[in-house]
A protein has these predicted regions:
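Structural register within alpha-helical repeat arrays
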Residues: 1, 35, 77-81, 120-121, ...
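TPR alpha-solenoid repeat register
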Residues: 31, 65, 117, 150-151, ...
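Alpha-helical adaptor scaffolds
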Residues: 2-6, 136-208
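Structural motif corresponding to the intra-repeat A-B loop/turn of tetratricopeptide repeats
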Residues: 8, 42, 94, 127-128, ...
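TPR/TPR-like (Sel1-like) alpha-helical repeat modules
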Residues: 23-24, 36-61, 135-148, 207-213, ...
Length: 254
């Protein structure tokens, strides 16, 4: 019956059926599996988080699938907590971010070490105006576990002390001299400190290692603001060619 209800797009009815069945057979693997499916359809992330330990204990789904589900569950719960903080801050701009930070502390260790979960949490913090806390988190993680994904975000976030933030990132360059993502972040952090020449140098070095739309756009924008319109337009054209994968074809000379 529960299967038919799920197949018939009636997840609420299926859930009611399955909860009755679970009272009779609390550990039945098939009931647990269908419960998981019902909660997923209903996007009831909190109940799913409570169900996961039982799914793991009974080996209802493969471990790799369960780990991926757990990441998905906590990611959605973090987003819900951030939305709650956003609503609170509309009423009171000084409202704390406790719903979000408390939930972060609840995360299982392996989820809290996942670079994409860290990235999402840092983005949520920054989006709620706490860039300083986001920068501190990213700095601590990057010191011990390098991630190109996280260094990109680190370059976008303004910490409490932009000068110190740049100096810290420059220390990382000693061991990663040819990392284009780090060089892009350093260019952005140099801009934050109004070090225009240094920023351009970092962007240019990054581009030599990897032609990337994001870096082309940053260097083009900087050149435009430094009065170098021709160089800016040339870079924009290169960025468009990169975007659309244009073939290398002869062109008329200006």
């Amino acid at each position: 019956q529960a299967q038919l209800q799920l197949a018939g797009n009636r997840p609420e009815q299926a859930l009611a059926t399955l909860l009755r069945l679970r009272k009779e057979s609390p550990h039945h693997p098939f009931v647990l599996k269908l419960l998981k499916n019902a909660y997923l359809r209903l996007e009831d992330w909190r109940e799913l988080s409570r169900l996961i330990p039982e799914l793991r204990k009974r080996s209802v789904v493969p471990e790799s699938e369960l780990n991926e589900l757990e990441r998905q569950v906590w990611q959605n719960l973090l987003e819900q907590a951030a939305e709650e903080c956003q609503r609170s801050r509309k009423e009171n701009p000084e409202a704390s971010l406790e719903p979000l930070t408390r939930l972060w502390d609840e995360l299982p260790g392996f989820v809290r070490r996942d670079e994409y979960t860290i990235r999402d949490y840092a983005r949520l913090l920054a989006g709620l105006g706490d860039e300083a806390q986001a920068e501190t988190l990213l700095r601590k993680v990057l010191r011990n576990h390098w991630s190109d994904e996280l260094i990109n975000l680190y370059g976008r976030i303004q910490g409490q002390d932009p000068e110190e933030q740049l100096l810290i990132a420059e220390q990382w360059l000693k061991h990663r001299t040819n990392n284009p993502e780090l060089l892009l972040a350093l260019g952005r952090l140099s801009l934050r400190n109004e070090l225009w020449g240094k920023a351009r140098e970092y962007f240019e070095t990054s581009l030599k290692l990897r032609r990337n739309r994001e870096t082309l756009a940053e260097l083009s924008r900087l050149n435009a603001h430094m009065g170098e319109e021709e160089a800016s337009i040339k870079l924009l054209m290169q960025g468009l060619e990169t975007d659309h994968g244009l073939p290398d074809l002869p062109m008329p000379r200006a």
